[in-house]
Regions:
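Hydrophobic alpha-helical segments, chiefly the membrane-spanning helices
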Residues: 1-320
């Protein structure tokens, strides 16, 4: 019971902290006349991935490497299969040609890069599979390249978009209070969440990798799921694609990059199956959008994606 309360309370603090940090930082940036484009691509993007970042970094520091990796791998699988699948069940998703030819292949590439980093035992000179500090720097280098690419395409399309970030205006003292409170919520909530998840793993007799791949991953992805389904209910399901692409790239390149830089991450029970499902889920997202019904992910395909996630999760639990 205590572990469940720690998990729920920690997640609530993390989400509240992420919102506070994002709102406060964006208000300060706006006061210093930083453009909405830069705010959206940096502060807001960081805020949406802050739960995964905090949990993975704290897990790495606490010696729970499997939970750190499982959180990222599981979140990305959840995003690609459950979020896109549930959104398509509400309303079919039309995918732009640029997204199909450029952005989704980047997600596939990120999954392949992670696979190579996880399996380069000889290069790391380790006796076990590990995402080393050097791998972390490689992932962060890819993140910088991705951000440079994102800024370039955003500037090119800025005039066409015409939509600004909705940023709360507030006094400087209030912004600082939001930032400080947000950071405190993220750190304290993250520690509670990691402690609760580790405790549940021990009490249930399951590995931390399974907890990370399922419970932790699903919990940290709930904001993206809620945002995407709400957008579909408002007849704008395409937002889900942007959410998933941005989140998945951020998770692998930045979250895992930072976590591995803080402390090398042995793969442990995160095996070839989990990494293969990660790659397959990215490929499936590309295939259903590219080859069927003129770049539209239909309700039937959405049901297929949700079904794939349910089968994968059931397999993980059955193996314990």
């Amino acid at each position: 019971m205590l572990n469940t309360l720690l998990l729920i309370g920690g997640l609530a603090l993390i989400l509240a902290g992420a919102n506070g940090l994002t709102d406060g930082s964006a208000a300060v940036a706006k006061r210093f006349r930083i453009s909405d484009l830069v705010i959206g691509l940096t502060i807001v993007a960081f805020g949406t991935s802050a739960p995964e970042l905090v949990i993975s970094v704290l897990s790495a520091l606490n010696g729970s490497a499997e939970m750190a990796i499982g959180n990222v791998v599981g979140s990305n699988i959840f995003n690609a299969l459950m979020i896109i699948g549930c959104t398509a069940l509400v309303l079919p998703i039309k995918v732009g040609e640029g997204t199909m030819s450029k952005e989704i292949p980047l997600v596939i590439l990120s999954s392949l890069v992670l696979f190579v980093c996880a399996k380069d035992m000889m290069l790391d000179r380790e006796a076990v599979y590990v995402i080393s500090r050097s791998d972390g720097f490689v992932l962060l280098a890819f993140f910088l390249i991705f951000m440079r690419y994102t800024f370039a395409i955003a500037r090119n399309g800025a005039d066409e978009a015409g939509e600004e970030q909705k940023i709360k205006e507030m006094p400087v003292w209030k912004s600082v209070l939001y930032i400080a409170g947000g950071l405190a919520g993220l750190i304290f909530g993250g520690q509670l969440f990691v402690d609760g998840a580790s405790g549940l793993a021990r009490s249930w007799g399951v590995s931390e990798s399974v907890i990370g791949l399922t419970l932790v991953a699903g919990g940290t992805s709930l904001p993206e799921l809620a945002t995407s389904v709400t957008a579909a209910l408002k007849k704008n399901p395409g937002i889900a694609i942007g959410n998933v692409i941005g989140s998945n790239l951020f998770n692998i390149f930045f979250v895992l990059g930072c976590s591995a830089t803080v402390s090398p991450l042995p793969m442990g029970n995160i095996n070839n199956l989990d990494l293969s499902v990660l790659i397959a889920s990215s490929l499936l997202l590309w295939l259903v959008g590219w080859f069927f019904r003129k770049r539209t992910i239909t309700r039937l395909e959405g049901a297929l994606m949700v079904g794939c996630y349910v089968v994968y999760t059931a397999y993980l639990i059955a193996q314990q």
